[in-house]
Amino acid sequence: MIFPVLPFLVGSIVLSANTQNATEKNSTSASATESATTEKTSSSTDNKAPEQSKEPPHDPEGVKPPEGFQWKIWAKEPLVADPVAFTVLNDGSLMVVESERQDRGVEDNRYSPWWLMEDLRARTVEDRLAIYTKWASKRVNGMDWYTKYADRVKHVTDTKSGGVADTAVNFSGDLREPLDGTAAGVLQVGDSVFVTCIPNLWRFQDKDGDGVAEVREKMFTGFGVKTSLRGHDMHGLVLGMDGRLYWSIGDRGYNVRTKEGAVLQDAARGAVFRCELDGSNLEVVFRGLRNPQELAFNDLGDLFTVDNNSDGGDKARIEYLPDGGDVGWEMHYQTLEGANKRGPWDQEHEWFMFDPTDVVQPAWLTPPVAHLTDGPSGLVAYPGVGFPEKYNGAMFVCDFLGGDAYSQIWSFKLEPKGAGYEMKDAEVFLREVLPTDVDFGTDGCMWVTDWFDGWTSDGTGRLYRVWQPESFEKSKAAGGADILKKGFRGADTSDLLAWLDHADRRVRQGAHLELAARGGAAIDSLVALTHNFQTPERARLHGLWALGVVARKFGGTTTGDKACDELMQLAADPDSELKAQATRALGDSRCAKALDLLRAMTLDENPRARAYACAALGRLQDKEAIANLTAVLWENDNADPWLRQAATTALARIGDRAKLEVMAADQFPQVRLGALLALRQMRDPAIGRLLFDSEATIALEAARAIYDLNIESQMPMLAALGDRFCDH
């Protein structure tokens, strides 16, 4: 029987590599995280919940912000109840997602153990519906159980300018089909409101202005093939600097057909998706997540999430999400207990921080940036206005633990380190609140949704505003709220260019996306701005991002060529960050005439530029770059896991098996490992040749790949590998 071979080999190979010190690291992590570390009820109840308050609902005695900040209740039940997520519109009103289906329509395998094995086998949403139908007798009123309650999106407004909400309208209509839920993400872009509610990504539009959507379009369907744990749903809708829509899903998996006819499928892993606003070019950009809640871009246009722990002694993780990365979680790990608790997730240190001396942690995964929170939920990047300067560059994450006495909102900063990031300045920002989501209004105030109590839907909820008076006045003086309310479509080009240096990142982003949409009418102005060294760096950066959008959307035209030419100029800029960003944009826009430049950029002294160059060459499938990528692997020598990931993902996308086999025989182990990691992404049986590598860690990595991917042709060789470590 082959099944027990890999765990045995892991232990044997690790011992042969003398890894005692590596396996002892983080030895205190389990005891530090075995206490209640739970996800928000509207998203999950992964851990044992504290007892729900038996007292009637009451207003909190006081949310506790930092000294000098103020707060107020803006809305409460019945206007807002069971709030999961929200977005602040440019006119100052809110779209709030409510979920009344928690544990009464949105289910959880832990409380429905009878269908666990079937759920593990499910591959499509139709499979899940068949499971619900088969076991309908377990529910009160059978299948009606799944349609009695609804999730929805409410448009909540202060129509009387009284400083509190006074009106709430059911904007989306009820979402109550058996496969639905949790509705957990909402974002307005233009006249469209996008909503994530498994199994669908929705687009809603209110054409007649009555506050209710007449257009209800399922852009995509097929998300959430499994039940998994309650709350491991679709979240995190956010607009990228590239003008594309991004969102996340937990380990309920997906089986989705794109507009172009391709099928994206992974039944047991969470992921991050992106597509154009019209739904074209849907793709997976990151894999292997467990329960990522919201997504947030920082001021450099890099993407992050905070992913929850599994109650197995592991910790919640801040994850940097580079294109093609993989965290390593699989849904069935949650079911493993006893001596094999959480399987390789814990035993092979998959959730650990990167340590170059730890030969146990797999090289194929993308490690976390930091461990923070116990129940991560809503996430937002500070837009640059409304708070004191100490929060510039900060992110805020909700830490939901089932009661306001032990929940909070954290602030933290992320700074580039090598090709990745490191966390700085983590501190609790807001206490005495049970937060599900956090965002910033156009006026600079922070908004927070409060589930209020417990884990299940009970018809209560709050919406708070938090602000610092002096900084709030400065935010008003900056005028960003007026700009955002008026919109960008009718603005003069000169104003748009000036706004690229606005204090509010949302204004800068809106301006650069509008300039990009104008294409040829704005290209010369963008080139002049980015080419001028006297232009402030952040204005040049947003101008560069606009050029990247133009190069992508107008490729093959004179306008697109102009944008590509300027990006090539910027890739030689003395500003190291602009150089790195231009490199990324060239690959993202598939600018083929930049290939020579991109190959040269793999030697750049800035590791961010090197990583982006690798990613670009992979996107362009440049076979001539294999030597450059090999050099990156050799020089890096496994020191920077994010740079290694960029190079190996590029090699996999290029997909030249013959050259990878040559690399697999290279004299340098870091090159052989890089070839193996690329072959793993390709699911190529050629991995088998590395099972007997002289480096035990490479042999282990090959064994993992064959076992994890079930490469049947190599299973006999994997079994034979036991002879290398068995005593006879």
Model region roles, listed by residue range:
Residues 34-495, 516:
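Beta-propeller domains with acidic blade repeats across secreted/periplasmic ectodomains
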Residues 18-28, 46-50:
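Cleaved targeting-peptide boundary
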Residues 219, 495-497, 525-530, 566-568, ...:
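Buried hydrophobic core positions in alpha-solenoid tandem helical repeats
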Residues 478-487, 506-519, 538-558, 565-572, ...:
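Structural detector for internal amphipathic alpha-helices that build alpha-solenoid repeat scaffolds
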Residues 307-308, 322, 368, 383, ...:
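Active-site proximal loops enriched in glycine and acidic residues that flank catalytic Cys/His/Asp
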Residues 1-20:
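Sec-dependent N-terminal signal peptides
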Residues 225-228, 259-263, 280-283, 367-370, ...:
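Alpha-helix capping and helix-loop boundary segments enriched in small/acidic/polar residues
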Residues 161-163, 208-212, 275-280, 385-389, ...:
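Secondary-structure transition/capping motifs at alpha-helix termini
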